[in-house]
Amino acid sequence: ENVSIGAALEYAVKILGVKDIIVMGHAHCGGVAALCKSINNDKEGEAKDNPTDLIKSWVDIAKPALSKIDFDHNDANIEVNSERAVVLYSYNNLLTYPWLKDAVSRNSLEIHAWWLDFKSVMLWKKAQGSDSFIPMDF
């Protein structure tokens, strides 16, 4: 657990009175692509030296998010599904902070999970009560 993340969240919500937290992901995310590549290399038994060990350590935090993604099938949506899975993973991780979960249940805080498709210029949000994403209306 990274204490600085919790401290920043605690300061924002408890001291500054932030009412909304947005977990934002986006299409063609290099971090998620690197994580997917790392998972495929692990499956194939390829151990590669990584000149970006700090970046790898950072993206590896989200590795559990991709446990339900089937990388063995060449699915056209695998990139989008992986990116959105990481957003949901981060969203759910926020709710592991008891004081954040409590603030959400008291309706004094809202946590949003969004995913942006740069190409279509569409913003998607986590559907309430579901792990699916729906387009946002403006």
Please report, for each region that a protein language model flagged, where it lies by residue.
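Divalent-metal-activated hydrolytic enzyme cores
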Residues: 1-20, 31-138
